[in-house]
DNA sequence: CTGAAAGCGCTTACAG
DNA sequence: CTGAAAGCGCTTACAG
């Protein structure tokens, strides 16, 4: 298909057809309330007749408003981060703002270069999954002077704003529950990343303070059912009498449930299992997975809302928003 | 934190410091090979000293190249589409091209408005999940005169290019396999969307041509394990002697496996089960799920490659790329 | 190998 | 309620 580059319609084409100035066309498109109805109608008709679509590069250059929010994620392949992006997307919908997506595939190097690439894009706000830790990156973001929302991890000193929950708190919550249920040989299984380690720490500290024994197995695992099987295997090897396990996410927990079933170990009779994330998978499994509810979508949506509020210059709000944690006790303990 | 809007560094600041013209700075940044090494070094040092980051809106306006590829998905919340986006992202990495993400939440209305919003953004290419069916939308995209890659669904008449597989072919492949394995009471379960219905059609046609009875249950289900349970229930209600079921995706199939286990129905003895998508979940389940391998990432990556090649004006290649289908026979039939 | 001039297509004050 | 002028910060030919 040989397509001739259509000579695109510009704002002065519309102005000429409508018999007004370019500025009136511009105004009709962005502040129609400031234009006399009759004029507005003529302009709108001209826009439709010509199929005029404003050039956003020109608009962004002149107005210093790109209508773009950057979102930086470790990987869009992990459903929890995808859900967070979806929350941001829904928050932005209706404002005609678009998302510029940066996926750095868990590579620190790609993260830095993406941050710099996004920095040149006149973003109106930036939302990142995780905290920005590098001093030079923080300085870069600060120099941009745009709203920045760090999500998932909480910190006392966000670059600008943060929305998330305490990973140590999640671990501690799970341990407290197990202790209260009379379990005494506890274990944690999860990824060997910053979030996993924080959950492990909160879990084991609380367990030991409660006079229970506790092991933590953190490994380079993704969000894979098969990894849950492996973690279970390692946990039982390290601490054979384990009677309660907290996994860093529901997928790992379901993997462990499958492995426990294959081994004929009763849940929760022999071992109690708890996940994190409240995924549909855990709800549909039998026995239904107990979990700590952390809703990825409900991190993304407020992050988007906060970014919008900051862009509008209203609702300063708190610097740090803790979305909190809820224990969802179901059948696995 | 009260941040003063940093007076941003512009290209002429760099030019002044380096003692060259703006144009030489510009050239150093995009075609360093055309600049004398000594000059280049001076410019690069000035860029670093000042922390200069080019304004991409101005660059896009002047060069008519935005460095942005649009990606339109029904929802980023479905992991298969997220994987496709990840494939596109990886394909674009290293070219300093960014993804503008449009998530329309399966709403035809939002899809149309997003398409129009993206149309104004000087995209260098557009990748969409699914086919663009509306004539007005197709006309809009054609008028943009940019590469367009439709993914997942195949068609003989793409707007520009298409990468995907035949949904009817997938259904037919599953049915042929079941027939060859001596099954005679077949069923399909899946979503009541365009892809689900096409898979159902291919499946039932082939089944009946093979003298097997076949029912197809298509419902408004997402990609949920619980939906797989429900579909199984409905299938057995409609056709109690069903001995082989093809599900539109692996998640539904695993849901059915859980339900079959709860009901004490042997797999594959009593019922054979096959999914589609080759998800890790199916591989980690026991018995391991047989599936038709369709790799979402491997649809996204070539889509990105094709877009890049078209942007570069090289490698015309075929208009339609069929990524093909592979039957992965494991333990469930 | 380097630069002066013109222009990309909008919007921002400001004036009336 | 509407418009003339200036400018946003780059890059594109073109010339030398």
Predicted features along the sequence, with ranges:
Chain A
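Acidic/polar helix N-cap motif
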Residues: 13, 31, 107, 166-167, ...
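Conserved functional loop/turn residues at catalytic and ligand-binding sites
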Residues: 13, 19, 29, 33, ...
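Alpha-helical recognition/docking segments in bacterial nutrient-uptake
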Residues: 1-9, 64-176, 180, 237, ...
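ATP/adenylate-binding site constellation spanning eukaryotic-like Ser/Thr protein kinases
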Residues: 40, 66, 85, 200, ...
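Bacterial carbohydrate/catabolite-sensing allosteric modules
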Residues: 1-6, 49, 90-95, 143-150, ...
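Short gly/ser/thr-rich secondary-structure transition/capping motifs
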Residues: 49-55, 109, 129-131, 257
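N-terminal helix-turn-helix DNA-binding module of bacterial transcription factors
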Residues: 1-67
């Amino acid at each position: 298909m040989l397509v001739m580059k259509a000579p695109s319609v510009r704002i002065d084409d519309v102005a000429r057809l409508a018999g007004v100035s370019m500025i009136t066309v511009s105004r009709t498109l962005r502040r129609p309330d400031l234009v006399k109805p009759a004029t507005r109608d003529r302009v709108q008709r001209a826009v439709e007749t010509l199929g005029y679509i404003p050039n956003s590069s020109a608009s962004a250059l002149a107005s210093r408003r790109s209508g773009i929010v950057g979102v930086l994620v470790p990987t869009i392949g992990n459903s929890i981060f995808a859900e967070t992006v979806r929350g941001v997307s829904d928050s932005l919908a209706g404002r005609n703002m678009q998302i510029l997506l940066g996926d750095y595939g868990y590579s620190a190097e790609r993260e830095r270069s993406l941050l710099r690439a996004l920095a040149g894009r006149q973003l109106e706000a930036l939302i990142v999954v995780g905290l920005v830790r590098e001093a030079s990156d923080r300085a870069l973001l600060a120099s941009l002077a745009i709203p920045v929302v760090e999500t998932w991890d909480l910190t006392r000193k966000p670059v600008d704003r943060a929305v998330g929950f305490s990973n140590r708190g999640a671990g501690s919550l799970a341990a407290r529950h197990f202790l209260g249920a009379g379990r005494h040989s506890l274990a944690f299984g999860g990824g060997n990343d910053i979030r996993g380690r924080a959950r492990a720490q909160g879990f084991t500290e609380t367990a030991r303070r409660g006079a229970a024994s506790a092991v933590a197995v953190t490994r380079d695992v993704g969000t894979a059912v098969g990894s849950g099987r492996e973690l279970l295997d390692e946990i039982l090897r390290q601490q054979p009498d384990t009677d309660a396990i907290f996994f860093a996410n529901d997928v790992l927990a379901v993997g462990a449930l499958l492995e426990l079933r294959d081994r004929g170990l009763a849940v929760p009779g022999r071992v109690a299992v708890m996940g994190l994330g409240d995924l549909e998978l855990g709800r549909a499994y039998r026995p239904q997975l107990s979990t700590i509810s952390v809703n990825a979508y409900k991190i993304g949506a407020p992050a988007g809302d906060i970014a919008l509020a900051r862009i509008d210059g209203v609702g300063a709000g708190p610097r740090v928003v803790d979305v909190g944690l809820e224990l969802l006790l179901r059948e696995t303990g």
